[in-house]
């Protein structure tokens, strides 16, 4: 982990790195978000062909809350570059959570691709509302590493 005290101009490595370790292959690509309902930081981490979901109160100590992916979505390649975001449902007052998963290879036309899952998230566990359906963000053969930003100007 690294941190900044000057709004991202410079970074310092945390003295007690690593903050999280694993014996699993392909343990990478952490995405960290703030979960307002639980008042905790949430990290989604790619591990092989699954996503692991962790929580933390301080960004230094992490607890494994759940795993997602077994039996869901495409598994033609390594799962990478996860993202987790809450979005409004158009025309309603509802919101749903979207878990984004990039894989390489394994896309519908070969090469890399981005799949996504829509469902609920309670701060510990993501539940896919349609596990029998694989949803693709793009039908090209090289769409990859989709990311979102937090606190962007004008809520973009």
Question: Which residues does each PLM region occupy?
Answer:
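Beta-rich carbohydrate-recognition and catalytic domains
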Residues: 1-30, 34-81, 88-140, 153-155
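Catalytic cores of secreted or luminal carbohydrate-active enzymes
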Residues: 145, 150-156
